[in-house]
Amino acid sequence: RAARPGPTAPFHATAAGGEAARLIVEKAGGQLDMVFFTNGGAEANENAIRMARLHTGRHKVLATYRSYHGATGGAITLTGDPRRWPNEPGIPGVVHFWGPYPYRSAFHSSSESEETERALAYLADTLMVEGPHTVAAVILEPVVGTNGILVPPPGYLAGVREICDEHGIVFIADEVMA
């Protein structure tokens, strides 16, 4: 290990970091030409929000309830459970919305397809009242982890992607569990 140092702080270039970046770009099948390493998930989420705001010129970020995005100042604001309460008001511009949860549906759905349809309609309604032209990003966990392993019903993530694309909103997938 001493002969070939591993990754260090992200701002230091190392052969191991370069090789990891090359493998990530290769695995992405030509859809990436740059990799941005961070020290951890919360920092990655904070940087993703910064990039989305700079890229779109917009300020708001939509995040789901029943989510955990980290314990740093910005990431805890994105978190959609009671852990964020002692840290409020947190960073400005964060709006929470309900995602799908077929087991205890906030949308009173009777099937997974109905849950998907109603959750996507709720997201679209939230965007309408917030003003889609003010929203930089939607961040969510594709598989919710710390609030139970909550796998979204079929079609939900593709529907979120479609809504984001329609309005020029960055879709941030904070993935840890899948």
Language-model-derived ranges and their functions:
Residues 120, 150-178:
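Catalytic PLP-binding core of fold-type I/II PLP enzymes
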Residues 144-146:
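Alpha-helical transmembrane segments of integral membrane proteins
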